Amino acid sequence: MGALGAFQMDRFLWISPCLWYLILGYSVGFVVRHRGEKILSGLMACALMLVLGATGFTILKNSDIKSNLQKLRNPEYPLLSYSDYYALGVLDQVQSFLQDETGMSQEEYRVVSLGIDPAAALYHGFYCLDGYSNNYSLEYKHAFREVIAPALAESEYLRAYFDDWGNRCYLFGSECPGYYTIEKNGFYFQHLELDTKALRALGGDYLFSSAYIANSEELGLKLLREEPFETDDSYYRIFVYEVADE
C-alpha cells in the first residue's frame, strides 16, 4: 500500500464544516430565489431547519461540551476534563519543586512525559522533547526512535505505529501499548523499556511519569521524590525522574 497505508480517510471530516456552509449558502439562496413559490420554498425551509437541527444536535451530542457537563455533574464520569488533561494543580507542583531543587528556570532543561500527553507539560511552560506533530524532521524522528527502540522491539503494534506513522513522538511502554494517559489506579511499570543514554544524548534531563517505574535504577533514572505529585481529585499522580549523565 505504501503511502496509502498511512492515509486516514476520516481526515476528510476536517473540511466537512466548509461543505456544510456551502450547502447552507446554497439552500438559503434557493429559498430566496423561490420565495414566491410558497409551497416549494416552505418545504425547502423546513428541510433546511431539520438538517441544521439534526446537525446541531449531533455536534452537541459528540462534542466536548457534553463530556465536560457530564464531568461537572458526576466527577466519576470516565472521560478526562480540561483540568484532568492538563494536570492542573499537579504540574504546577512539579515546576515549583524543580525550581527549588535545581535553581534552574524551565528553559534551562528539557523534559519528556510517560503516560501523560506531552501537551500537558508544554501547557505549563516546560520545554519538551516529545509531542504530537505532523511537521518535524525525519532526522529528529530517527534520533527519538533510538530512545524508544527497546519498547518498539517488544511490541509490533508500537513499532508499526511509530515507524509507519510517527505523529505521536511519545515515550511508549510495551506493558500498556496504546495507552497514552495512565490514571492513578495502581498500575506501575515493572520493566519499562527505554534507552536513557539516547535520551540524554537528545538533551533529556527529566522524565515525568504518571506511573511508578520499578526498574528505574537499572535504566539510569533517579527518582527525585518518593512521594508522587498529585491532588485529591487529580487524574494523574506524577513521579519525577532525573536522567543520569552518561
Describe the role of every protein-language-model region.
Residues 29-64:
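Signature aromatic-anchored transmembrane alpha helix within multi-pass, membrane-resident enzymes
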Residues 1-22, 27-28:
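Membrane-helix boundary/interfacial segments in multi-pass membrane proteins
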Residues 15, 36-42, 46, 209-219:
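Extended, basic/helix-rich recognition subdomains
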Residues 20, 33, 212:
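Residue-level marker of positions within ordered structural domains that often coincide
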Residues 60-246:
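Extracytoplasmic
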